[in-house]
Amino acid sequence: MTILHNFINSSKRNLSILGIFLLLLLVSSCSSNEEMPDERLVEKELYDQAQTRLKNGSFSTAILSLEALESRFPFGRYAEQAQAELIYAYYMNSQFEASQSASERFINLHPRHSHTGYAFYMKGLAAFTDDSGLFSRYFQSDLAKREVVMAQTSFGELSEFISRYPESKYVPHAKQRMIYLRNLLAEHEIYVADFYMK
Protein backbone atom coordinates (compact mmCIF):
# COMPACT_ATOMS: atom_id res chain seq x y z
CA MET A 1 0.00 0.00 0.00
CA THR A 2 2.81 2.44 0.85
CA ILE A 3 4.53 1.70 -2.46
CA LEU A 4 1.36 2.59 -4.34
CA HIS A 5 0.89 5.70 -2.17
CA ASN A 6 4.51 6.82 -2.80
CA PHE A 7 4.12 6.21 -6.54
CA ILE A 8 0.94 8.32 -6.68
CA ASN A 9 2.55 11.16 -4.67
CA SER A 10 5.68 11.19 -6.85
CA SER A 11 3.52 11.11 -9.99
CA LYS A 12 1.51 14.09 -8.73
CA ARG A 13 4.71 15.96 -7.94
CA ASN A 14 6.15 15.17 -11.37
CA LEU A 15 2.92 16.30 -13.04
CA SER A 16 3.01 19.53 -11.01
CA ILE A 17 6.59 20.19 -12.08
CA LEU A 18 5.71 19.40 -15.69
CA GLY A 19 2.69 21.72 -15.49
CA ILE A 20 4.79 24.58 -14.13
CA PHE A 21 7.42 24.00 -16.81
CA LEU A 22 4.81 24.06 -19.59
CA LEU A 23 3.22 27.19 -18.16
CA LEU A 24 6.59 28.96 -18.05
CA LEU A 25 7.33 27.83 -21.59
CA LEU A 26 3.99 29.17 -22.80
CA VAL A 27 4.47 32.53 -21.06
CA SER A 28 8.02 32.97 -22.36
CA SER A 29 7.02 32.11 -25.93
CA CYS A 30 4.17 34.62 -25.82
CA SER A 31 6.36 37.43 -24.52
CA SER A 32 9.12 36.87 -27.08
CA ASN A 33 6.62 36.85 -29.95
CA GLU A 34 5.46 40.33 -28.98
CA GLU A 35 8.99 41.66 -29.36
CA MET A 36 9.83 39.96 -32.63
CA PRO A 37 9.15 42.01 -35.74
CA ASP A 38 6.21 40.83 -37.82
CA GLU A 39 7.52 38.97 -40.87
CA ARG A 40 4.88 40.58 -43.05
CA LEU A 41 6.23 44.08 -42.47
CA VAL A 42 7.63 45.75 -45.54
CA GLU A 43 10.98 47.48 -45.44
CA LYS A 44 9.70 50.98 -44.58
CA GLU A 45 7.42 49.69 -41.82
CA LEU A 46 10.24 47.66 -40.30
CA TYR A 47 12.53 50.69 -40.41
CA ASP A 48 9.86 52.88 -38.79
CA GLN A 49 9.33 50.24 -36.11
CA ALA A 50 13.06 50.22 -35.37
CA GLN A 51 13.11 54.04 -35.18
CA THR A 52 10.21 54.08 -32.74
CA ARG A 53 11.89 51.49 -30.55
CA LEU A 54 15.17 53.43 -30.59
CA LYS A 55 13.42 56.67 -29.65
CA ASN A 56 11.60 54.91 -26.81
CA GLY A 57 14.86 53.50 -25.47
CA SER A 58 13.75 49.92 -26.17
CA PHE A 59 17.17 48.94 -27.42
CA SER A 60 16.79 45.16 -27.21
CA THR A 61 13.67 45.22 -29.38
CA ALA A 62 15.20 47.86 -31.66
CA ILE A 63 18.08 45.44 -32.22
CA LEU A 64 15.60 42.75 -33.27
CA SER A 65 13.97 45.12 -35.76
CA LEU A 66 17.29 46.37 -37.15
CA GLU A 67 18.69 42.85 -37.49
CA ALA A 68 15.48 41.75 -39.23
CA LEU A 69 15.67 44.75 -41.55
CA GLU A 70 19.27 43.98 -42.42
CA SER A 71 18.67 40.27 -42.99
CA ARG A 72 15.40 40.59 -44.95
CA PHE A 73 16.43 43.57 -47.06
CA PRO A 74 20.26 43.40 -47.30
CA PHE A 75 20.34 45.61 -50.40
CA GLY A 76 17.33 47.70 -49.50
CA ARG A 77 16.97 51.41 -49.07
CA TYR A 78 17.57 51.30 -45.29
CA ALA A 79 20.21 48.56 -45.08
CA GLU A 80 23.21 50.83 -44.52
CA GLN A 81 21.30 53.00 -42.04
CA ALA A 82 20.22 49.88 -40.15
CA GLN A 83 23.84 48.74 -39.93
CA ALA A 84 24.90 52.13 -38.53
CA GLU A 85 22.05 52.20 -36.03
CA LEU A 86 22.83 48.67 -34.88
CA ILE A 87 26.18 50.00 -33.64
CA TYR A 88 24.37 52.49 -31.41
CA ALA A 89 21.65 50.07 -30.29
CA TYR A 90 24.18 47.42 -29.26
CA TYR A 91 26.18 50.03 -27.35
CA MET A 92 23.14 51.39 -25.53
CA ASN A 93 22.05 47.84 -24.71
CA SER A 94 25.48 47.22 -23.09
CA GLN A 95 26.47 44.76 -25.80
CA PHE A 96 29.87 46.38 -26.25
CA GLU A 97 31.56 43.56 -28.15
CA ALA A 98 28.64 43.41 -30.57
CA SER A 99 28.89 47.19 -30.99
CA GLN A 100 32.60 46.88 -31.79
CA SER A 101 31.95 44.08 -34.28
CA ALA A 102 29.15 46.04 -35.94
CA SER A 103 31.46 49.07 -36.15
CA GLU A 104 34.24 47.05 -37.78
CA ARG A 105 31.79 45.46 -40.18
CA PHE A 106 30.36 48.85 -41.17
CA ILE A 107 33.86 50.30 -41.68
CA ASN A 108 34.88 47.36 -43.87
CA LEU A 109 31.68 47.34 -45.93
CA HIS A 110 31.33 51.11 -46.32
CA PRO A 111 34.76 52.78 -46.08
CA ARG A 112 33.57 55.95 -47.83
CA HIS A 113 30.09 56.24 -46.29
CA SER A 114 29.14 59.42 -44.42
CA HIS A 115 28.65 57.40 -41.21
CA THR A 116 32.05 55.70 -41.30
CA GLY A 117 33.51 58.32 -38.96
CA TYR A 118 30.72 57.60 -36.52
CA ALA A 119 31.55 53.89 -36.74
CA PHE A 120 35.20 54.63 -35.86
CA TYR A 121 34.06 56.78 -32.94
CA MET A 122 31.70 54.14 -31.57
CA LYS A 123 34.33 51.45 -32.01
CA GLY A 124 36.60 53.47 -29.74
CA LEU A 125 33.88 54.07 -27.16
CA ALA A 126 32.82 50.44 -27.08
CA ALA A 127 36.40 49.23 -26.62
CA PHE A 128 36.36 50.37 -23.00
CA THR A 129 33.52 51.00 -20.61
CA ASP A 130 34.05 51.69 -16.94
CA ASP A 131 32.44 49.63 -14.21
CA SER A 132 29.26 51.59 -13.80
CA GLY A 133 27.13 48.51 -13.28
CA LEU A 134 25.41 47.06 -10.26
CA PHE A 135 28.48 45.16 -9.05
CA SER A 136 30.72 48.23 -8.90
CA ARG A 137 28.13 50.29 -7.02
CA TYR A 138 28.32 47.93 -4.09
CA PHE A 139 31.95 46.88 -4.36
CA GLN A 140 34.08 49.92 -5.13
CA SER A 141 36.49 48.50 -7.67
CA ASP A 142 39.42 50.74 -8.46
CA LEU A 143 39.66 50.85 -12.23
CA ALA A 144 43.34 51.79 -12.09
CA LYS A 145 44.13 48.43 -10.45
CA ARG A 146 42.47 46.37 -13.16
CA GLU A 147 43.90 45.20 -16.42
CA VAL A 148 44.07 48.24 -18.71
CA VAL A 149 44.40 46.60 -22.10
CA MET A 150 40.86 47.66 -23.00
CA ALA A 151 41.62 51.25 -21.98
CA GLN A 152 44.73 51.25 -24.17
CA THR A 153 42.75 49.81 -27.07
CA SER A 154 40.03 52.41 -26.66
CA PHE A 155 42.60 55.21 -26.49
CA GLY A 156 44.20 53.97 -29.71
CA GLU A 157 40.86 53.63 -31.51
CA LEU A 158 39.77 57.12 -30.49
CA SER A 159 43.15 58.54 -31.51
CA GLU A 160 42.76 56.94 -34.93
CA PHE A 161 39.23 58.35 -35.20
CA ILE A 162 40.44 61.89 -34.43
CA SER A 163 43.30 61.67 -36.93
CA ARG A 164 40.99 60.38 -39.69
CA TYR A 165 38.01 62.62 -38.97
CA PRO A 166 39.33 65.82 -37.31
CA GLU A 167 36.22 67.80 -38.32
CA SER A 168 33.69 65.32 -36.92
CA LYS A 169 31.16 66.56 -34.39
CA TYR A 170 32.18 63.65 -32.16
CA VAL A 171 35.81 64.83 -31.80
CA PRO A 172 35.25 66.94 -28.64
CA HIS A 173 33.69 64.01 -26.79
CA ALA A 174 36.38 61.66 -28.09
CA LYS A 175 39.06 64.03 -26.75
CA GLN A 176 37.37 64.15 -23.34
CA ARG A 177 37.22 60.38 -23.29
CA MET A 178 40.90 60.17 -24.22
CA ILE A 179 41.80 62.49 -21.32
CA TYR A 180 39.86 60.21 -18.98
CA LEU A 181 41.60 57.14 -20.40
CA ARG A 182 45.04 58.79 -20.22
CA ASN A 183 44.45 59.63 -16.55
CA LEU A 184 43.28 56.09 -15.90
CA LEU A 185 46.39 54.67 -17.54
CA ALA A 186 48.59 57.06 -15.52
CA GLU A 187 46.88 55.96 -12.29
CA HIS A 188 47.54 52.38 -13.25
CA GLU A 189 51.24 53.12 -13.81
CA ILE A 190 51.44 54.78 -10.38
CA TYR A 191 49.71 51.78 -8.82
CA VAL A 192 52.18 49.40 -10.47
CA ALA A 193 55.14 51.54 -9.37
CA ASP A 194 53.83 51.65 -5.78
CA PHE A 195 53.34 47.90 -5.82
CA TYR A 196 56.94 47.24 -6.86
CA MET A 197 58.35 49.86 -4.47
CA LYS A 198 56.87 48.02 -1.46
Residue ranges and their predicted role:
Residues T2-F7, L26-K198:
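Acidic, polar-rich low-complexity tracts and alpha-helical solenoid repeat scaffolds
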Residues T2-G19:
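Bacterial N-terminal signal peptides that target proteins for export
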